[in-house]
């Protein structure tokens, strides 16, 4: 198991960059959007916050790692689609 985990972490590092860099970028993005919402007196539903957090996570991977990895972009679209569908009455 340790070998499998090491291989997985190495592969992810090659794709997304060092985890500490990703964490730094992602936490800045999350703090920024939450600050801007609060500054404007806005709130969101839990699914919207979660989707935004996951989108920021994916953007962090793009910024810190490989911007040409299509799956990251598809994931962003997927999280946005889940919220848009729910707003249109389709809960997934």
Feature locations, PLM:
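Intrinsically disordered, low-complexity regulatory regions
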Residues: 1-92
């Amino acid at each position: 198991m340790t070998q499998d985990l090491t291989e997985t972490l190495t592969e992810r590092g090659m794709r997304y960059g060092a985890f500490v860099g990703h964490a730094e970028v992602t936490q800045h993005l999350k703090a920024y959007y939450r600050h801007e919402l609060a500054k404007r007196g806005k709130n969101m539903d839990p699914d919207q916050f979660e989707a935004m957090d996951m989108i920021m996570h994916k953007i962090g991977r793009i910024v810190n790692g490989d911007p040409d990895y299509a799956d990251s972009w598809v994931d962003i679209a997927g999280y946005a689609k889940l919220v848009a569908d729910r707003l249109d009455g389709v809960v997934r």
